[in-house]
Amino acid sequence: MTGKKALPAVTIVKRFFQQYWRRIVPLCLLTIISLQLHPSKQYTVDEFLERGSLRVIGIAGPTTFLPHGEHGVRGLQYELLRQFANDLNIRLEIEQAPNAEAVIAALEKGEADLGITGLANNDPRLAGLEISKPYLSTTQQLIQRSGTRLSPSEAKIAVSQNSAEADLIEQLQPEADVVQLRYATPDELLEEVNQGQVDYVVINDSEFAARRTAFPQLSLKKQLTTSQLSWTIRPRDKQLLRFANRFLTQTGQDGSLQRLSNFYSQGNTFNAFGVKTFQKDIQQRLPLYQAQFKKQANTHDMDWRLLAAIAYQESKWDVNAVSPTGVTGIMMLTKNTAEEMGITNRNNPQQSILAGSAYYQRMIDKIPDTVHEPDRTWMALAAYNMGYRHVLKARELSLKQGDDPDKWLDVSRHLRQLPRAGQALVYVQEVRRYYDALLLQDSRSHWMASLEKKWVVAE
C-alpha cells in the first residue's frame, strides 16, 4: 500500500479523453468514413442465386476462353465455368478484360464474382482476393529467341510488373537486367522477345505452348519452377469460395477436370519443325484457297478458319494429296462422298471445298438441338471423320451409363469403346489444334497495332 487514494474509474476516463481527444476524434471519423467507402461485406451465395447469374471477368486467350462472335465461346475455362454455373443452376456471364490488373480491380469493386487472371497463386497482386483450389499446375519457363547466346545473368529479362515472375527472377538471377512491364499480357511479353527488345521473358508452359505457332522463332531456354493456377474470387466471398472449392474437388475426383485439361492441352504442342512448317503453309498455301474457305463458310454460317483447319488436317492444303485408301484432294473426299455431294473432280479445290463444307454441315444438322457449342462442333467433326452412326452409338452409351450425351467429354469416353474410334478422337484433337492456331494467327493483328500505346515500362 502506498497510502495514496485510488482515483475513481470515471475520473481516469475523463482525464484520458481530455488529454487525447484531439487524436481520438479524427481517428474515429476516418474509421467511419473508411467503413462507408470500403464496407467489409460478407457475401452470401443467395446474392448471385437470386440474380441468377455468375459474373466472370477474364482475359480472353487460347488457355482461357475464345469468343467466336455468332459461333459461340469455347476454351478450357469457358467449359469449366459453364459446368460450374450449370451445377449452381444459374447462367454464366463472361466479360473480357485487357489485362490481369483490370480483372483484379473489377473483383475488388464487386463488379464481378469470379476472375480468370492467369496469375500464379503466389502472385503479390492477388493479395486480398479469395483464392480457390488449384485447377492447373504449370511450369514457369525462360523463353528466348532462337540463337540467343547470352546467359540469363547477363541478359535483359522482361516480366510483368509486381508479379510472382519478377520475384522469382530477382531470387534466381539477381545480376540480370530485369524490365518490369506494366499491364503486360502473355502475347505482349512474347512479342517483346520476338522483336528483340529483350533477351528473355518468363511465362508459364501452357501459355507458351498455346501460342507457339504464332512465334516460330522462340524456344525454351530453361524451366524455372512449378506454380499453381486458381480461380480468383471477390474479397470476403466465403460462400462462393466454398462452392468453387467443392466443385473443383468433385471434378478432380471424377476425372472430368483432367479430361477437359487434356483435351485443351494435348493438341497444343508443336515441335520446332511443326511450327515452321505450319507458318510456311500459312504464308504459301493458305492464300491460294482462303477465298474459297470464306465463301463456303459464309454459305453454311460457319467460321472459315474451322473449315481451313479441317482441310489442313486432311491434306495440309495440298490439292493433289492422296491417301493409301484412295481419298484425295484438299478435303480428302472418298469417291462415294464426292458423288453424294454432286461433284465430279475431287482434285479441283473449289469443288472439293464446296463438297467438304456441305458434308460437314450435314453432320452438324444431324446433331440434336440439345447439344450446344462447342460440344456440337466436336461431335460433328467426329461424325465427319468416321460417320454419324458411331457418334449416335456413343451418345446412346453415355445415356445408358448415366453420363451426359450432350457433352463431348462424356461422349468421347464412350466413343473409345467402339472399333477404330481412336482415329476420330485424334482427328477432333488435331482439328482443334489447327483451329486454335489459325484463330491466334488471325487475332494478333488486332492488338499488334496498339502495342506501343498500351505499354508503359515500370519505373
PLM feature spans:
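Extracytoplasmic small-molecule ligand-binding "clamshell" domains
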Residues: R22-R23, Q36-L119, D123, A127, ...
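Extended ligand-binding regions for polar small-molecule ligands
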Residues: S34-P39, G75-D87, S146-A166, E170, ...
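Periplasmic-binding protein-like
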Residues: A60-G61, K133-Q144, S206-L248, N271-G274, ...
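A ligand-binding cleft/hinge motif common to bilobed small-molecule-binding domains
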Residues: T117-G128, E191-T225, L392-K393, L397-G402
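Short, functionally critical alpha-helical segments immediately adjacent to catalytic or ligand/cofactor-binding
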Residues: M302-D318, I353-S357, A380-N385, V431
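Substrate-binding/active-site groove segments that recognize
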Residues: N320-T344, Q350-R362, P405-K407, V431
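Catalytic and substrate-binding regions of cell-wall glycan-acting enzymes that process beta-1,4-linked
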Residues: W378-Q441
